[in-house]
């Protein structure tokens, strides 16, 4: 069985191939989301606790959370179910998936280190891969650096260094800050609100003038009809 182990603290991951089936007995009959002590895998894993996040069987069918079966089943899936990506809105399709219970015909398991053990695992816990990109949203940048709402977040954006190549010089890139509130955006929103209010006032004034004109026309029409009727009475 292949174990894809990830260590989110350091941002590292490693694939380990276990040939002895007796060593992976600790994962049998376990479900996705359960935590398992990995002492039986070897002395280097003593004290480690893994969390099962997924897996695939020998033919590549993925395990699906919420399917309480140790075998393969066929389900009608949509875009919200997982294990299926629709090509258009509302599309559904019947596909084969594995249950969330680990069985002997599982070929690979995805694991996350929840608790670190006594010894270091070479290539996994002794190395660190920092995130290459920082947050883009203004609120997330404030949360990362513990900034107040009055402080400007533009000077705290994490820049990414790009090495020099044959076609370009060394430079740095920064992401465009999303949902950034500046005096320019505040003035723009204020101008839009004022424009909308002026448009509403103009429309209401024009509607009042039109109603007044219609009332005058109706009064004039009523007077003309009264005069015509009086002339007819006199003629008789």
UniProtKB/Swiss-Prot annotation:
Component of the 40S small ribosomal subunit. Plays an important role in controlling cell growth and proliferation through the selective translation of particular classes of mRNA. Part of the small subunit (SSU) processome, first precursor of the small eukaryotic ribosomal subunit. SMART domains: Ribosomal_S6e (SM01405). GO terms for molecular function: structural constituent of ribosome. Its main location: cytoplasm. Keywords: Cytoplasm, Nucleus, Phosphoprotein, Ribonucleoprotein, Ribosomal protein. PANTHER family: 40S RIBOSOMAL PROTEIN S6. Belongs to the eukaryotic ribosomal protein eS6 family. Pfam families: Ribosomal_S6e. It is found in: Cytoplasm; Nucleus, Nucleolus. Ribosomal protein S6 is the major substrate of protein kinases in eukaryote ribosomes. This is Small ribosomal subunit protein eS6. The gene is rps6. One of its GO terms (biological process) is translation. GO terms for cellular component: cell cortex; contractile ring; extracellular matrix; nucleolus; ribosome; small-subunit processome. Component of the small ribosomal subunit. Part of the small subunit (SSU) processome, composed of more than 70 proteins and the RNA chaperone small nucleolar RNA (snoRNA) U3. PROSITE patterns: RIBOSOMAL_S6E.
């Amino acid at each position: 069985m292949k174990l894809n182990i990830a260590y989110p603290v350091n941002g590292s991951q490693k694939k380990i191939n276990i040939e002895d089936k007796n060593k992976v007995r600790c994962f049998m009959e376990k479900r996705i989301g359960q935590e398992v002590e990995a002492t039986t895998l070897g002395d280097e894993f003593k004290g480690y606790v893994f969390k099962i996040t997924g897996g695939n069987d020998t033919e590549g069918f993925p395990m699906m959370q919420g399917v309480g079966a140790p075998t393969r089943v066929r389900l009608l899936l949509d875009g919200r179910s997982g294990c299926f990506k629709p090509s258009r809105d509302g599309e559904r399709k019947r596909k084969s998936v594995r249950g969330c219970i680990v069985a002997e015909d599982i070929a690979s398991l995805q694991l996350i280190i929840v608790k670190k053990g006594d010894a270091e695992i070479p290539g996994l816990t002794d190395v660190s891969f920092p995130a290459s990109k920082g947050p883009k949203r203004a609120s997330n940048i404030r949360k990362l650096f513990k900034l107040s709402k009055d402080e400007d977040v533009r000077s705290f954006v994490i820049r990414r260094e790009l090495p020099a190549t044959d076609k370009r010089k060394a430079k740095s890139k920064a992401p465009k800050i999303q949902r950034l509130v500046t005096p320019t955006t505040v003035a723009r929103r204020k101008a839009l609100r004022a424009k909308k209010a002026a448009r509403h006032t103009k429309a209401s004034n024009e509607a009042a003038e039109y109603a007044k004109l219609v009332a005058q026309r109706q009064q004039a029409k009523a007077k003309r009809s009264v005069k015509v009727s009086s002339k007819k009475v006199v003629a008789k």
